[in-house]
Amino acid sequence: MSAKFYICRHCGNLVGVIHDSGVPMMCCGQKMEALEPNTVEASGEKHLPVVTVEEGAINVRVGSVNHPMVPEHFIEWVYVQTEHGGQRKALKPGDDPSVTFCLGDDKAVAVYAYCNLHGLWMTEL
């Protein structure tokens, strides 16, 4: 099962689904919009997660060219989907656009990065 994320276009709330019962996600009295990765017209070289796998961990850098990390334009979070669940790490302006996830014996299957301007980006592993 792939990860699912939704956004409220009214207030900006973001939701990551743990269990999908099929009921529409609602916020501010309206249906939330499903985020589809890699669909916004923007530079993939600055948005696609670049992943290196090491024993028990993965390192993720957002972009083959570092993504900007300024208040107007930054990566808000990175999420790694694994065979048994997932992990998320938050970033803020001024941070380096890279994170490390310790996975133990779990296996990563996809990595997502969310840009405050250009939406959701994903690399399948």
Task: Go through the PLM ranges and name each one.
Residues S21-K31:
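Cysteine-rich micro-motifs
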Residues P97-F101:
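Short strand-edge motifs at loop-to-beta-strand transitions and within beta-strands
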Residues V62-V70:
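Short amphipathic, basic-aromatic surface patches that mediate peripheral association
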Residues N116-E124:
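Short acidic/polar inter-strand loop motif in beta-rich domains
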Residues F5, P24, Y112:
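Residues immediately within or flanking Cys/His clusters that coordinate Zn2+
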Residues V17-S21, L35-N38, T123-L125:
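Short Cys/His-rich "knuckle" micro-motifs
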Residues C8-C11, C27, C115:
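Short cysteine-rich clusters marking metal-coordination/redox-active sites
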Residues K107-L117:
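Short, aromatic- and glycine-rich surface loops/edge beta-strands on solvent-exposed regions
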